[in-house]
């Protein structure tokens, strides 16, 4: 079935963008590693779907608020309708590529946002095409959707991009359950080429040995060494021998806590350093 749809899409030129943080503190662990994401030419809706647009697609009138109520089942029905009518949405699509309609991936969303192609709404929560992950290990570097690896209830969740309620320039990655109807969500669509070939992903394993050695060094520098140096400089050298256990424990604790806020920047993963998944 082909529908006479009038949805507006804007072209986002191919390019690259960096996603994530390279700050070393533990509070940034879920946002690491910083990595390069390359995007092809794709089309994105400048605005999220409105109630009128959604009513037109589904061919029945929605009540107030229903355009912000989503579940996986409802989303799949909508995408099926739109993919069947993809030629109507963008008549001059490149026929040499296979295209799909779906929510944007995080890389596509960031690229469109950087290029000022999209309009955001204060306090909104936009559905993304990516699965929920604890960090960016295994993230797709060619901007294809990230699928869920593993078991558990998080497989029913989807990643979302949440906009600050007062500052339009602040946004953060969050998630929403899609196994049931969920209020407060918005949907923006992309028409993007299906990625061919094996995906390129952020390596799943970090250099654990190096991270442990670095942590021991910084715990010593910020915690253990000052813990022993301070009583020595204050003329309390005897306490170093009698209370060494307390000094060591205190130094370990303080050095450990400093890691929550500061550690040296972590390496950035570039596209050419990505892991090709067979």
Predicted feature locations:
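Extended beta-strand/loop cores of jelly-roll/beta-sandwich
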Residues: 1-108, 112-114, 167, 171-278
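Alpha-helix capping/hinge segments and adjacent helical runs
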Residues: 130-173, 179, 185-187, 191
């Amino acid at each position: 079935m082909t529908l006479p749809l009038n949805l507006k899409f804007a072209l986002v030129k191919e390019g690259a963008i960096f996603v994530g943080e390279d700050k070393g503190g533990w509070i940034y662990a879920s946002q690491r590693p910083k990595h390069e994401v390359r995007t092809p030419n794709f089309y994105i809706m400048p605005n999220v779907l409105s109630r009128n647009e959604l009513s037109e697609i589904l061919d029945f009138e929605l009540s107030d608020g229903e355009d912000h109520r989503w579940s996986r089942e409802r989303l799949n029905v909508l995408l099926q309708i739109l993919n069947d009518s993809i030629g109507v949405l963008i008549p001059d699509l490149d026929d040499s590529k296979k295209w799909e309609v779906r929510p944007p991936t995080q890389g596509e969303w960031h690229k469109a946002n950087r290029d000022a192609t999209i309009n955001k709404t204060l306090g909104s929560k936009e559905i993304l095409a990516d699965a929920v992950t604890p960090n960016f290990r295994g993230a797709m570097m060619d901007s294809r959707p990230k699928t869920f690896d593993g078991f558990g209830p998080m497989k029913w969740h989807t990643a979302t991009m949440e906009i600050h309620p007062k500052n339009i320039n602040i946004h953060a990655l969050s998630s929403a359950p899609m196994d049931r109807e969920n209020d407060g969500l918005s949907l923006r669509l992309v028409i993007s080429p299906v990625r061919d070939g094996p995906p390129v992903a952020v390596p799943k394993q970090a250099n654990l040995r190096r991270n442990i050695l670095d942590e021991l060094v910084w715990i010593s520098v910020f915690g253990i060494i000052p813990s022993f140096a301070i009583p020595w400089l204050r003329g309390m050298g005897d306490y170093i021998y009698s209370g060494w256990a307390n000094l060591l424990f205190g130094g370990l604790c303080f050095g450990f806590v400093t890691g929550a806020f500061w550690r040296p920047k972590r390496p950035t993963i570039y596209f050419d350093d990505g892991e090709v998944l067979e």
